[in-house]
Amino acid sequence: MATRTINNTSQTKGRRTSVGDVLKPLNSEYGKVAPGWGTTVLMGVFIALFAVFLVIILELYNASVLLDGIPVSWSSLES
């Protein structure tokens, strides 16, 4: 490890790597908060779409009352 002692205090110097150089810009905005709502609305839309997707999958799995008129069987998919 690259540790150097100066005046009874140790200082560690990190090693530069190509992965670190690539990831450095992602960490440069740490602690900063954009003003306003930012992408909160977009995130809400995606959460709502995901909830609809989960409800559809659950209804197909349970053959729910909402799907009474729709045949849900693998044999109906055959030509």
Curated annotation (Swiss-Prot):
Species annotation: Coleochaete orbicularis (Charophycean green alga)
Gene this chain is encoded by: psbH
Residues spanning the membrane: 41-61
Entries under SUPFAM superfamilies matching the protein: Photosystem II 10 kDa phosphoprotein PsbH
Membrane topology note: Single-pass membrane protein
Post-translational modification: Phosphorylation is a light-dependent reaction catalyzed by a membrane-bound kinase; phosphorylation occurs on Thr residue(s) in the N-terminus of the protein.
Record-linked Gene3D superfamilies: Photosystem II reaction center protein H
PANTHER family per UniProt: PHOTOSYSTEM II REACTION CENTER PROTEIN H
Role of this protein: One of the components of the core complex of photosystem II (PSII), required for its stability and/or assembly. PSII is a light-driven water:plastoquinone oxidoreductase that uses light energy to abstract electrons from H(2)O, generating O(2) and a proton gradient subsequently used for ATP formation. It consists of a core antenna complex that captures photons, and an electron transfer chain that converts photonic excitation into a charge separation.
Residues that bear Phosphothreonine: 3, 5
Location of this chain's protein in the cell: Plastid, Chloroplast thylakoid membrane
Quaternary state and interactors: PSII is composed of 1 copy each of membrane proteins PsbA, PsbB, PsbC, PsbD, PsbE, PsbF, PsbH, PsbI, PsbJ, PsbK, PsbL, PsbM, PsbT, PsbX, PsbY, PsbZ, Psb30/Ycf12, at least 3 peripheral proteins of the oxygen-evolving complex and a large number of cofactors. It forms dimeric complexes.
Pfam families: PsbH (PF00737)
Main localization, broad class: plastid
Any one Gene Ontology molecular-function term assigned to this protein's record: phosphate ion binding
InterPro entries xrefs: PSII_PsbH, PSII_PsbH_sf
Keywords: Chloroplast, Membrane, Phosphoprotein, Photosynthesis, Photosystem II, Plastid, Thylakoid, Transmembrane, Transmembrane helix
Any single biological process term in GO: protein stabilization
Gene Ontology cellular-component annotations: chloroplast thylakoid membrane; photosystem II
Protein name as it appears in the record: Photosystem II reaction center protein H
